[in-house]
């Protein structure tokens, strides 16, 4: 599953930082030393680029103390970010395992877009849980996969909406055809009113439950 997702980003954002595996590769990690890490930190870590979030019992003095600790950073460099441009592509990776992993991705919206909330609702309607369209159609009604879900990956200037499914070799073609049928039907008919209402309530519940966790509130 992780390999499929890594390959997905590698091809969709080929040539940009978003297309690189987050853990790096053997070739990129081998030359790194303690000295190069310290040099990078001193050059690029700047107070004005640092966000400190806390949750819990902190006094103003505590926050001032934390801010002072980070104020000594003296970096002045600026990374040049190559714009991530979505590129349609097909990538295959062969591996001798019982289960096949399939990812389909489409251009989404950025983390700053006003449409990001609509995108989240769309994602949940299609594959956000056991009552979603894809889960019911592909897994429950037709038994064509082991798991299926949708997810979004919004970034500063771009985003993806993706469908993941784990399935067997004997059902992958039928599952893909059925997924495409569900997408075409959604584009033609749109969501039902009860789907929108249910998904809105799910989003509200998830938000409220998340606020009970101090770590989630901090993030």
What is each model feature region?
Residues 1-77, 110, 140-219:
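Charge-rich, well-structured scaffold segments of protease-associated domains
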Residues 128-144:
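M16/MPP (pitrilysin/insulinase) zinc-metallopeptidase core fold and M16-derived inactive scaffolds
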Residues 78-133:
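His/Glu-based metal-binding/catalytic segments typifying zinc-dependent metallopeptidases
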């Amino acid at each position: 599953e992780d390999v499929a997702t890594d390959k997905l980003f590698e091809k969709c954002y080929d040539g940009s930082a978003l297309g690189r595996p987050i853990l790096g590769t053997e070739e990129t990690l081998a030359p790194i030393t303690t000295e190069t890490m310290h040099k990078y930190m001193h050059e690029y870590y700047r107070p004005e680029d640092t966000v400190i979030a806390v949750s819990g019992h902190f006094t103003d003095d505590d926050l001032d103390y934390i801010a002072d600790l980070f104020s000594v950073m003296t970096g002045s460099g600026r990374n040049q970010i190559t714009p991530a441009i979505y590129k349609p592509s097909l990538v295959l990776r062969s591996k001798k395992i019982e289960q096949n992993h399939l990812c389909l991705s489409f251009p989404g919206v950025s983390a700053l877009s006003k449409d990001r909330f609509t995108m989240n609702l769309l994602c949940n309607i299609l594959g956000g849980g056991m009552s979603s369209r894809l889960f019911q159609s592909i897994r429950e009604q037709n038994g064509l996969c082991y798991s299926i879900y949708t997810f979004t990956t919004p970034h500063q200037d771009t985003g993806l909406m993706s469908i993941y499914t784990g399935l067997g070799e004997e059902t992958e073609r039928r599952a893909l055809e059925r997924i495409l049928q569900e997408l075409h039907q959604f584009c033609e008919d749109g969501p039902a009113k009860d789907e929108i209402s249910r998904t809105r309530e799910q989003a509200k519940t998830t938000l409220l439950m998340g606020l009970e966790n101090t770590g989630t509130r901090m993030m």
